[in-house]
Amino acid sequence: MIVTHDGIFHADEVTAIALLQVWDMVANAEIIRTRNMDIIANADMTIDVGGIYDGVSKFDHHQTDYAGELSSAGMIWEYLGVSDNYPTISQLIREVDEQDTGAKRQEQHHYCNIISSYNADDIYGGEQGAAFNDAVAFAAKYLAALKKREDREKMLREIADCTAIKTVGENEGDPDFDMLDDSEYWSITGEYRYAGIRVARIPKGIRFVPVEYFIDRCELVIQWDEGQGCWSVQTVPLKKGEFGAKLKLLNSKNAIFVHKAGFIGKYPDGGEICVTVQDGGLCPTICIEM
């Protein structure tokens, strides 16, 4: 049984309970909203009520002997112990703490105020319980989506880190050293060996990785586009969130499609892919033996 206070609810206790749900810590637990001290004393966990913080089962921050900066949301986030793995969620929790403790007022359309908007007109009426449940459901869905995205980003970063990079004109004829799939051989050649163009190739069967994960590591990324059944070649931007890149793809005879801005091209499967790029005043053709 989880107990939190009745009356008006805020983002901190709503988020605290949602976090416990998303991390499967309170499956099917009964949630009671009350300030009745007898019920609070018999709770398995108290959140934002009760006047005690012990970091184990009691998570209130209103008592005068608590001098920390956390709200009940931050207390539960510390209890879960996963903050280092989820920086985006950690930032959101910090903002919830700031709002609830008065350290910083968030913007009108911030998550905190969206949660508060779920309160019923009569906070002690019959609709308030359902409104609280709706707010927790919304928070849980949002937090679950953030968790899924951060888990995915971690996986994609690991794939990018395990992808070998080859440079035009180097390692020709060497055994394949693509760490993701050492059963496939691939090599690259180019008209201008001194161009120093670096290529990352992700084999088929590996999840599509955004090129931003290769910033500062290479200039081109080639990977299989499962949806379109072809190879995708993309230029790597110089900075995250920008299109500007060292290279620009040009139309070549075996390309299915090359975007007019030159940041992506599609190429058929089988044999050799020849990619023509603009590199300053040079226009080398890079051939990738698939």
Regions found by a protein language model. Name each.
Residues 221-225:
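Flexible, glycine/charged-enriched surface loops at secondary-structure junctions
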Residues 104-205:
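Hydrophobic, aromatic-enriched interface-forming segments
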